[in-house]
Amino acid sequence: MKKMNLVTAALPYVNNIPHLGNLVQVLSADAFARYSKMSGIETLYICGTDEYGTATETKALIEKTSPLELCNKYYKIHKSIYKWFNIEFDIFGRTTNKHHQDIVQNFFLKLEKNGYIKERETEQFFCNKDSIFLADRYVIGECPECQSIAKGDQCENCSKLLNPIDLINPKCIICKNKPVLKKTNHLYIDLPKIKRKLEKWIKNSTTSKNWNTNALKMTNAFLRDGLKERAITRDLKWGIPVPKKGYENKVFYVWFDAPIGYISITKNLVKNWESWWKNNEQVNLVQFIGKDNILFHTVIFPSIEIGSKENWTILNQLSSSEYLNYENLKFSKSEGTGIFGNDVITTGIPSDVWRFYIYYNRPEKSDFQFMWQDLMERVNTELIDNFSNLVNRVLTFQKKFFGDVIETIEIQNKFWKQIIPKYNKILNLFKKTELKSALKEILKISSLGNKIFQDNEPWKRKDSSPQETKELISNLIYLIRDLSILMMPFIPETSKKIQQFFGNSYQFSTKILGTKSGIKRIEFTEILFNKLEQKKINNLKLKYSGEKNMEEKEQPENLFREKVLLKVVKINKIERNPEAKNLFILKLDDGTNENKQIVSSLEGYYTEKELLGKHIIIVDNLKPAKFRGIKSEGMLIAAEDKNKNFKIIIVEDSIKNPIPGERIILENDQNKDLICPPKIDINKFSKANIVAKDGELKINGINLILEHSKNKILSKDIPNGIVC
């Protein structure tokens, strides 16, 4: 029988601030670890930040810092948020610790020695300007499905999973130049060769019965579809070096090194780390993850351990939750939607209230939508009107009518006969990591305590039957003590406060549940929680709905910045649409060596000779459209005055030698990192409200300029008017 619980929460990636949904795993593991320790089981709770890989390298480029400095910054942010939530890690480390490289490389060398590593030649995008192979998320272009700007792994607009080669007009995210496909060698773990041993381990009844249904279904489906060799190396700089000749400029894929971080983080801080990680006979490895991490913990990490042929502690109990979502919206810092860890701290709502609500709605079997109104209702009814009310009414009654001293009580067997079986059920739910169910069973006991108090009407019987009333209140006091123990994994600060009410006269141990001695007096009492008010909840809902930011976002200059992409192009050739002679087909040079064309109704305004060879400005991210069967990939911009006079903006009026492909930006956006806007329709462009004023193009008084030369965009022929 296994005697030790090794508890892990999925290592959070350290390139962002965790939102409420991200906190589910660390909170879940925290509750289980606290329960385990209260039960007298030797327990170690491990977590830490996952710091290597593409996302970190990319974010460091965006923030103009080094990957390590970025990790240092976000590690501190994560740690401070978890501390506020009162998450009691035994170890909270980092995958950049001093032991991580050695352990990862040793795993690789063992796998290679045992014949589980293969070498393959593949094609990958390479940026000639930056002299690097581009990871999937380093490539941007148009999604082939919806034409929005997308990264090479997935389109955020339509959610389509992509390969970089699927993108239309792919570009390097760093320099915006077009990459080329280049051959490169990578190492793969031979999962098909490990499959039989992996399946034998999975089918072991002691393992599979301790997994959630979603984990079993997903893992079995993955195995049924057939395991494939999986790349374990990447052409990056930020990662663990590959100890193999010819691979000096490559690192291990983050999914390969990250789960090994559980081990290295332990070794970095625990001397007897092998008694935890090389002790599969006695150690019960309990892992808490989200459903997006299931296969890494049920297939990949176990395969690495099995393939090493060493006695590593391997996954036994897996708690894989579904998603916690937000008000039917997407968590997004930039959009101001959803509440993130640092936001929670500023709400004025105590951490135990947040913990309670997350556990109460823990997405164990289905996704859950966080709703502000539901938060208020659940907290006010279950946490306050039920649990907190029982504590307050019983202790207040004792102090008011019988004083601070608790007399030795007569055990009311009928009372406890209802309660004790429920304790056993709750402890079993904890053991099975069914935390939401455990909490709701505890609240049922609290509700029963309130009912017993109400039904016995002690305020009426205190004078006529003082001894019976004292015994009733004393039994309820011991029930409150037990509830504080059972609630300790969920709301630790509140449980400690109740313990202080009784002069710290007991320990948080499951062994004393149901005992009726040890409490001598009530030292003090106070209200545990204040009710959440509707006005406060309404304000918080508005604050984190994105609506408060909408007015600012709808300002024309912000719309332009985020939605409109203007570029300089040169007119190389002009044709007429054979079916509509008034339509000019302009063949353009946009600096990318790609054939681009737009269709515009210019008959009566210009001749071909007047425009050929000129540089104009187009809306480059307009959704493609067809005019009389001819595709148009943008729209030229022109100025129009109040008399309906119409003139195209000619860039030669602003600068002597225009450069095709140069972007038009707001003057106050100089030297800033600019986003690549998605495809838009004409209405979005119109809302930018570009005008010609005193011969210069402006938005809300801000000049439009050429990005590199900084020259202002001029409207020579129509000094005042609208731009259309």
UniProtKB/Swiss-Prot annotation:
Quote any Pfam family the record assigns: tRNA_bind
Question: Is Chaperone among this UniProt entry's keywords?
Answer: no
**'KMSKS' region (motif): residue ranges:** 330-334
Q: Which reaction does it catalyse?
A: tRNA(Met) + L-methionine + ATP = L-methionyl-tRNA(Met) + AMP + diphosphate
> Coiled-coil ranges per the record?
none
Task: Look up keyword Nucleotide-binding and say if it applies.
Answer: yes
Q: What is its EC number?
A: 6.1.1.10
Q: Kindly list the places in or outside the cell where this protein is found, as annotated in its UniProt entry.
A: Cytoplasm
Annotated residues that bind Zn(2+) are located at C143, C146, C155, C158
Q: Which PROSITE patterns match?
A: AA_TRNA_LIGASE_I, TRBD
BP term (GO), one:
methionyl-tRNA aminoacylation
**What span is annotated as the signal peptide, if there is one?**
none
Residues of the tRNA-binding domain: 560-665
Q: Which UniProt keywords apply?
A: Aminoacyl-tRNA synthetase, ATP-binding, Cytoplasm, Ligase, Metal-binding, Nucleotide-binding, Protein biosynthesis, RNA-binding, tRNA-binding, Zinc
Cellular component GO terms held in the UniProt record: aminoacyl-tRNA synthetase multienzyme complex; cytosol
Q: Name one GO molecular function term.
A: tRNA binding
Co-factor binding comment? Binds 1 zinc ion per subunit.
Residues annotated as binding ATP: K333
The sequence motif named 'HIGH' region is recorded at: 12-22
- The protein's required cofactors: Zn(2+)
Entry's PANTHER family? METHIONINE--TRNA LIGASE, METHIONINE--TRNA LIGASE, CYTOPLASMIC
Subunit comment for this entry? Homodimer.
Summarizing the function annotation, the protein's role is:
Is required not only for elongation of protein synthesis but also for the initiation of all mRNA translation through initiator tRNA(fMet) aminoacylation.
Assigned protein family = Belongs to the class-I aminoacyl-tRNA synthetase family. MetG type 1 subfamily.
Q: What is this protein called?
A: Methionine--tRNA ligase
Q: Which source organism?
A: Borrelia garinii subsp. bavariensis (strain ATCC BAA-2496 / DSM 23469 / PBi) (Borreliella bavariensis)
